[in-house]
Amino acid sequence: MITFPHRHLLGIKGLTEQDITLLLDRADEAVKISRQREKKTSSLRGLTQINLFFEASTRTQSSFELAGKRLGADVMNMSVGNSSVKKGETLIDTAMTLNAMHPDVLVVRHSSAGAASLLAQKVSCSVVNAGDGQHEHPTQALLDALTIRRAKGKLSRIIVAICGDVLHSRVARSNILLLNQMGARVRVVAPATLLPAGIAEMGAEVYHSMAEGLKDADVVMMLRLQRERMAGSFVPSVREYFHYYGLDAEKLKVAKDDALVMHPGPMNRGVEIASEIADGPQSVIEQQVEMGVAVRMAVMETLLLSQNQGPRL
C-alpha cells in the first residue's frame, strides 16, 4: 500500500522531505525495472494517462510516455498543434473536454506559470506539472536529485552550483527548492542580467564568477541559455557568454575532483558547456535521461495507487 498525501504533483513547493524521499526510493525501484529485459509491469493496467503539451518537448514527453507504458497504462499524446486550441479553444475548455473522457492523470506542459494548478482545479483526475512557464518543473528536479543521490549516496551537506540562465529556468527554481529541502548547499552562478529578483531569499548563495561559484562544488549543474525566452539583450554575445560562463576544463578544475557535471538538456554545445566536458568522465547527463523515466514512473504510480490522496498541492 502506498501512502502519499497529495493528489497532484504541481511543484516541489509543498513537498516535505519525507514526500521527496518516498518518490526517490520508489524511483530507485523503477530503475531496476527499466534495466530488465522485460520492462513492462501491470501496476497501472486499465488506467489512462493523457500527455497535454502546449510547448514542444520531445525529451520530456517521450519520457512521460515511456514511463506510463512501462507501468501498463494506456497513454495518449495530445498534439496541440492539430487540436482545437489552434482554433481558439481555451486551456480550460480543453481540460474540460479531456476530463469528460475520464482520464486518470493529465501530464501538462504550458508556457504560462500556474497553468497546471489551474487545470488541477477544473478536472477530477490527478495532474502532473511537466513544466509551466518559468515557474516549476518538479520531475526534472526529482530526476536530478535521484542522479545525485545514486552517485554521491546523499543529498545533504553537498555543494551544488547551478550555473547560467537562472532567470528563465523553471529547472533552477525547482532544484533550489528541492535541494534546500534535502539539506544541500545551493549556489547560483550567473551574470546579474540572468538572475531573478529575490533569488537569495529562495535559499541560494549568489555568485557572478565561475571561479568563485564552482570552488569545491560537488555538483555543477549547467543551464541552457534560453534565447527563445529572451526579449532583450541579456548577454552581449554568445561568444562572450561562453568565455565567462561556459563550462570548460579550466573552469571545472576549481570544483572537487569527483564533481558531477549535469545539464537538463537540450544542450547548446559551445554556449554553456564545452563538448569535452559534456562527453567527459564527470558528466552524468545520460544518467539524468535514464533517471527521468524512473522518476516519472514513480510519480505516476505513487499518485494513482496512493490509498491516502489528500489535498491538492
From Swiss-Prot:
One of its GO terms (cellular component) is cytosol. Carbamoyl phosphate binds at R59, T60, R109, H137, Q140, G265, P266. The gene is pyrB. PROSITE patterns: CARBAMOYLTRANSFERASE. This is Aspartate carbamoyltransferase catalytic subunit. It is an enzyme of class 2 (transferase). It comes from Rhizobium meliloti (strain 1021) (Ensifer meliloti). InterPro entries: Asp/Orn_carbamoyltranf_P-bd, Asp/Orn_carbamoylTrfase, Asp/Orn_carbamoylTrfase_sf, Asp_carbamoyltransf, Asp_carbamoyltransf_Asp/Orn-bd. It comes from the Bacteria. Keywords: Pyrimidine biosynthesis, Transferase. Its EC number is 2.1.3.2. GO terms for biological process: 'de novo' pyrimidine nucleobase biosynthetic process; 'de novo' UMP biosynthetic process; amino acid metabolic process. It holds the Pfam family OTCace. Belongs to the aspartate/ornithine carbamoyltransferase superfamily. ATCase family. One of its GO terms (molecular function) is aspartate carbamoyltransferase activity. L-aspartate binds at K87, R170, R224. Heterododecamer (2C3:3R2) of six catalytic PyrB chains organized as two trimers (C3), and six regulatory PyrI chains organized as three dimers (R2). Pathway: Pyrimidine metabolism; UMP biosynthesis via de novo pathway; (S)-dihydroorotate from bicarbonate: step 2/3. Catalyzes the condensation of carbamoyl phosphate and aspartate to form carbamoyl aspartate and inorganic phosphate, the committed step in the de novo pyrimidine nucleotide biosynthesis pathway. Gene3D superfamilies: Aspartate/ornithine carbamoyltransferase. It catalyses: carbamoyl phosphate + L-aspartate = N-carbamoyl-L-aspartate + phosphate + H(+).
